[in-house]
Amino acid sequence: MKSLLVSLVIFLTSGAKKCKEDGKEKIPSCIQQKIDQIKKEAKWNPPAEVHEYSYNGKRVFYFTSNCCDRYNEVYDENCNYVCAPSGGYSGKGDMKCPDFKDKAKEVRLVWKDER
């Protein structure tokens, strides 16, 4: 009976870990696809980075751009465009989330192009 209980506990807890990656939430597949697309291109200068943030109670992903005059774009977990908090000619992004700098909390660096 004890081994059955232990087996059941192991089974149930292993299912809870499938959404985690090294103790962190798994990268959504659409975000991974965006990263994979960048990997197919020549290395950017500066190198591409993807950061995970918590913004307005949502999990979002900040993609750096490959040039100073392009927007640094933020996408939600479903790859819906949220805003561009920085970049562009003005450096202030698209002005759709002017509070990003103050309200967004960085969770982690998800990926950096180390090629």
Task: Show the residue positions of the predicted features.
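Sec-dependent N-terminal signal peptides
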Residues: L4-L12
